[in-house]
Regions:
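A short, proline-enriched helix->beta-strand linker immediately N-terminal to the Walker B motif
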Residues: 129-133, 162
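Catalytic Walker B motif of ABC-type/P-loop ATPase nucleotide-binding domains
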Residues: 135-139, 144
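Hydrophobic anchor residue at the start of the ABC signature
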Residues: 124
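Conserved ABC ATPase "signature" region
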Residues: 77, 81, 88-106
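Helical segment within the ABC ATPase nucleotide-binding domain
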Residues: 149-162
Length: 174
């Protein structure tokens, strides 16, 4: 496939299970090499300039890798530190990410105690934590309740005004 997404655009990959949506997302995030050709994010090749490309990406994989023995806040602090965010900036960004995904009542909760929907929100919070230019969301509403689906769709619309956003789904209304 060949495509370009401009800043501020929202692009969705729609298709049945096994159609290559997740594979495409993994190629774009640098987790898988393309079988032919190249993939680039913000002008950086995802294979040869992987770290530079990843600095511009917020990624929510279909199955969010979470440290369930951490609280939501500690998890975000840990990931922000790994990303090299300055301590004074990190506190503000954690507060903002938690507010955006409506996790305020759960910031001190252990991830192991959260429902699937709130774990998904935690994953989304880590994806937006560093204010990336490009958000890549793989099946962002899978397995969450109908109210959270509506809230997540609304947040995606808001984020799409600010960032380039790619998402995958096999649900047509998405």
């Amino acid at each position: 496939i060949s495509f370009e997404v401009k800043k501020g655009e929202v692009v969705g990959f729609l298709g049945p299970n096994g159609s290559g949506k997740t594979t495409t997302m993994r190629i774009l995030t640098g987790y898988l090499p393309p079988s032919t050709g190249t993939a680039s994010i913000a002008g950086f090749n995802t294979m040869t300039d992987s770290l530079d490309a990843r600095r511009h990406i917020g990624y929510l994989p279909e199955t969010v890798p979470l440290y369930t023995d951490m609280t939501v806040e500690d998890y975000l602090k840990f990931l922000g530190t790994i990303r090299g965010m300055r301590k004074e900036h990190l506190k503000r960004r954690i507060d903002s990410a938690i507010e955006r995904v409506k996790l305020g009542d759960y910031r001190k909760s252990f991830i192991s105690k959260l429902s699937k929907g709130y774990r998904q929100r935690t994953g989304l919070a880590q994806a937006i934590l560093h204010e990336p230019e490009v958000l890549i969301l793989d099946e962002p509403t899978v397995g969450i309740d109908p109210v959270q689906v509506v809230e997540t769709r609304q947040l995606i619309k808001e984020l799409g005004r600010e960032q380039t956003l790619l998402l995958s789904t096999h649900i047509l209304p998405e």
